[in-house]
């Protein structure tokens, strides 16, 4: 069940989702073509200036409201799992944050979101791979 306290229904409904997890050759996957071998790539949402998703991410990053990141991850994790996207995935690897930024902020927002995705799936989060 979604946490209405963290993300209201209106914000939840208007999150500008990419649905890239439903397209094999999506724009995120294409970014990696010729650079490295990957099996799958996707992105949860478009990040537009003035959008509510931007406000939510900023609350996570700059106000330290980690529960928002976990909740966003959980929402995306449910979409990934129900679509079958996670079927052949072994683990979730969050993008590392520069050590100085992590010291200042006290956490890596990518790891928080990854843990939310993991909470909606059976995938482990591996933070020491990259």
Predicted segment positions?
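Glycine-rich phosphate/pyrophosphate-handling loop used in enzymes and phosphotransfer proteins
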Residues: 1-130
């Amino acid at each position: 069940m979604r946490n209405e306290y963290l993300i209201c229904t209106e914000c939840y409904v208007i999150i500008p989702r990419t649905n890239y997890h439903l397209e094999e050759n999506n724009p995120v996957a294409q970014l990696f073509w010729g650079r490295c071998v990957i099996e799958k790539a996707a992105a949860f949402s478009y990040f537009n200036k003035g959008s509510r998703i931007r406000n939510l991410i900023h609350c996570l990053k700059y106000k330290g409201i980690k529960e928002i990141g976990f909740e966003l991850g959980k929402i995306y994790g449910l979409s990934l799992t129900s679509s079958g996207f996670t079927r052949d995935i072994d683990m979730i690897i969050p993008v590392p944050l520069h050590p100085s930024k992590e010291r200042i902020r006290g956490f890596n927002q990518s790891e928080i979101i990854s843990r939310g995705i993991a909470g909606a799936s059976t995938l482990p989060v591996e933070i020491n791979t990259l």
